Amino acid sequence: MIFLTLEHILTHISFSVVSIVIIIHFLTLLVNEFVGLYDSSEKGMLTTFFCLTGLLITRWIYSGHLPISDLYESLIFLSWIFSIIHMVPYFKKHKNYLSTITAPSTFFTQGFATWGLLTDMHQSKILVPALQSQWLIMHVSMMVSGYAALLCGSLLSAALLVITFRKVIRIVGKNNNLLNDSFPVDEIQYMMEKKSILKNTFFPSSRNYYRFQLIQQLDHWGFRILSIGFLFLTIGILSGAVWANEAWGSYWNWDPKETWAFITWTIFAIYFHTRTNKNLEGLNSAIVASIGFLIIWICYFGVNLLGIGLHSYGSFTLISN
C-alpha cells in the first residue's frame, strides 16, 4: 500500500512539474530576456527526472522486476530517457537546443501513460513465463532507449527541414516579386549577383547568421543523438534475437514487431548512408530521418494496437459489447 501511494504521488508530481516546465519553456521562447525562467525550466526537468527515477525504483521494488514489461511501464521508462537526453547539454554547459523537443516529448509521453491508458494497466502484474529471463533488462531497455534517442534525433531533423524550407519559400517569393515588377533583365541579373556576393561574404546579417548557426546545431545534435539511438537499437535487436533463440528456438520469426524493428533499423541505416555521401547529406538525410519518426511510432505502438504476434505482451485490451 505504501509503495502504491508513493508511486501515485511521484507520478502526479512529475507530470505537474513537467507541465509547468512546458509553460515556462514557451515563455522563454517568446521573451528571451527572462534568463531566470530558462534556469527554472531546467531545474524543473531535473525535478521531473528524479521523480521518474523514484517512480521506476519504487515500481521495481514491489514488482520484483525492472518496470519495462508492458506498455504503461515502457512509456514511463521512455519519459525517463527523454528527461536524461534533455539534461545532457545542460550539464555540459551547452545551449540546450534539445529542450524544444525533449520537454514536450516527456510531457506528452507521460501524460498519455498517466491519463490515456486504462487504470488497470497501471497495476503491476506477474511476468509471463516468456518474460522471466535475464535478457528482459538488456533487450527492452536498449530498444526503448533507442526509440527515445531516435525520436529526438528525428524531430531535430524535422525542425531542420522546417527552417530550411521556410527560407527557400521566402527566397522564391522574393524572386517572384522581382519578376512581377518587370525589372529589366540586366538589373535583375545585377541584383542576383549582388545577392550572391553578399551570401558568400564573411559578414552576413545577424538574422541569417543565427539561422545558419541554428541549422548547423540542429544537424550536429541530430546526427549525434541518432548515432546513439541507432547503436542502442542494434544492440536491442541483436540481444532480442539471442533471447528469441533461447525462448522459441529461432533467432528471427518475422512477427509484426520484428518486421517493423527491421524496417526501422533499415530506414536509419539509409540515413547514415546518406550522411557519408556529400551530395545526399543535409536535406536528404533529414527527410529520411523524418520518415523514420513515423516508422518508430508504428513499430512501438503497432503491435500494442493489433495485439497479435509474439511481442503482444501488455498490449491494449479491446473490450467489445
Swiss-Prot record:
GO MF term set: heme binding
What high-level taxonomic lineage is stated for the organism? Eukaryota, Viridiplantae, Streptophyta, Embryophyta, Tracheophyta
Where does this chain mainly localize?
A: plastid
By its UniProt entry, which NCBIfam families does this protein fall under?
A: cytochr_II_ccsB
User: Which keywords are on file for this protein?
Assistant: Chloroplast, Cytochrome c-type biogenesis, Membrane, Plastid, Thylakoid, Transmembrane, Transmembrane helix
Query: What assembly does the database describe for this protein?
Result: May interact with Ccs1.
- What GO CC annotations are associated with the protein? chloroplast thylakoid membrane
Tell me where in or outside the cell this protein is found. Answer: Plastid, Chloroplast thylakoid membrane
Membrane topology field: Multi-pass membrane protein
Q: What family does the entry list?
A: Belongs to the CcmF/CycK/Ccl1/NrfE/CcsA family.
* GO biological process, alphabetically ordered: cytochrome complex assembly
The regions listed as transmembrane in this protein's record are 17-37, 48-68, 71-91, 98-118, 143-163, 225-245, 259-273, 286-306
InterPro entries named in the record: Cyt_c_assembly, Cyt_c_biogenesis_CcsA, Cyt_c_biogenesis_CcsA/CcmC
What this protein is reported to do is described as: Required during biogenesis of c-type cytochromes (cytochrome c6 and cytochrome f) at the step of heme attachment.
| The protein, known as | Cytochrome c biogenesis protein CcsA
